[in-house]
């Protein structure tokens, strides 16, 4: 069986073209900068709902919030989240 042509450009032609590198020399650094800003401004914490590093422990709650008894987990979670 001989392989047929799908009509697409070969990958080697694409990555050796000037047009490819003009486009990607702009978009790759732009994505990096956008990701850095997303994390450094704290927007990632807000979007994903995770606590910021200084919010893990409050003055009232200094213990690690672990559930120890799986059969009474609901009650333990209510006790742990009571002050939040």
From Swiss-Prot:
The record's free-text note on cofactor binding: With its partner (PsbF) binds heme. PSII binds additional chlorophylls, carotenoids and specific lipids.
Gene3D superfamilies membership: Photosystem II cytochrome b559, alpha subunit (1.20.5.860)
Localization: Plastid, Chloroplast thylakoid membrane
Entry cofactors: heme b
One cellular-component annotation, GO: chloroplast thylakoid membrane
UniProt topology in membrane: Single-pass membrane protein
SUPFAM superfamilies per UniProt: Cytochrome b559 subunits
Quaternary organization: Heterodimer of an alpha subunit and a beta subunit. PSII is composed of 1 copy each of membrane proteins PsbA, PsbB, PsbC, PsbD, PsbE, PsbF, PsbH, PsbI, PsbJ, PsbK, PsbL, PsbM, PsbT, PsbX, PsbY, PsbZ, Psb30/Ycf12, at least 3 peripheral proteins of the oxygen-evolving complex and a large number of cofactors. It forms dimeric complexes.
Family stated for the protein in its record: Belongs to the PsbE/PsbF family.
HAMAP family for the chain: PSII_PsbE
Name this protein carries in UniProt: Cytochrome b559 subunit alpha
